[in-house]
């Protein structure tokens, strides 16, 4: 599991309770994990985190661009992400006359938002364990190369049904040192527009020096908006597109927090060594 993977995971952090720290796939939250979360202060039904039939948090957390995490915060397609995640798009939109990287940018209306060509936002549709399917032809005598070829071949067979829709992206991802295989399906939106970015003096304050320090003092955020067609489906850029209405958006609280409050993060981490043995 050292390789890059993009699948929605939950990170639980509770001050002073080290044994409860860790990262889990949302669909693998079991009764024990759910019970412990409630003991620590989680107050919602567990299916409010991940559901394939009802709106849930997984519908608000997105893959932004090539692998960053973003979150939907409004019923009009607003996405919050990091400044460094939007950096390339902001750079491409900048010019000598309008240096948005240096000076920042704020849109006052839908019409002023800037289309970010090539930028995508992907919403998770479903996750499915297909281990039994892709390993069904394996033999104990298979070499590692033969094993990989068989699994890859059946993975491609399984993904065939998604190839006709260019706005769906499906991929098979191995987990737990290739002992589990999941197919994850995303709806990919290709009309994404810049709404707000702070100047780099704020968004990139401290650079890489401060990047590994805590607390940090950088305003590392930017705001984009996802647009959809008139049927609220994914589409290429068009002036006729309208702000996307997500299945679920996360309310922003101004109440702050107090010591020992329950805390968790949902997103797309780059990698994890959870459950990795000392043998690697």
Q: What is each residue range found by the language model?
A:
Residues 1-4:
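Positively charged n-region of N-terminal signal peptides that target proteins for export
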Residues 8, 16-280:
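Terminal presequence/propeptide segments associated with secretion/organelle targeting
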């Amino acid at each position: 599991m050292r390789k890059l993977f993009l699948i929605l995971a939950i990170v639980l952090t509770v001050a002073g309770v080290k044994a409860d720290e860790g990262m889990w796939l949302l669909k693998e939250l079991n009764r024990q994990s759910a019970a412990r979360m409630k003991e620590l202060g989680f107050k919602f039904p567990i299916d409010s985190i991940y559901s394939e039939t009802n709106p849930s948090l997984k519908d608000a957390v997105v893959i932004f661009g090539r692998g960053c995490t973003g979150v939907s915060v409004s019923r009009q397609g607003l996405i919050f992400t990091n400044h460094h995640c939007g950096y390339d798009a902001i750079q491409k939109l900048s010019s000598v006359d309008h240096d948005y990287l240096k000076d920042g940018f704020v849109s006052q209306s839908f019409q002023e938002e800037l289309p970010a060509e090539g930028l995508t936002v992907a919403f998770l549709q479903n996750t499915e364990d297909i281990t039994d399917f892709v390993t069904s032809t394996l033999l104990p005598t298979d070499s590692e190369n033969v094993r990989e070829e068989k699994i890859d071949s059946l993975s491609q067979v399984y993904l065939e049904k998604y190839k006709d829709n260019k706005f769906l992206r499906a991929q098979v991802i191995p987990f737990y040192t290739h002992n589990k295989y999941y197919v994850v399906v995303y709806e990919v939106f290709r009309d994404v527009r810049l709404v707000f970015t702070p100047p780099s003096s704020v968004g990139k304050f401290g650079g890489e020096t401060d990047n590994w320090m805590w607390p940090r003092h950088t305003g590392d955020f930017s705001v984009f908006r996802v647009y959809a067609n008139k049927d609220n489906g994914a589409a290429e850029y068009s002036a006729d597109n309208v702000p996307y209405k997500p299945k679920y958006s996360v309310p922003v609280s101004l109440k702050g927090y107090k010591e020992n409050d329950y805390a968790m993060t949902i997103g797309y981490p780059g990698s994890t060594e959870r459950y990795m043995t000392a043998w690697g």
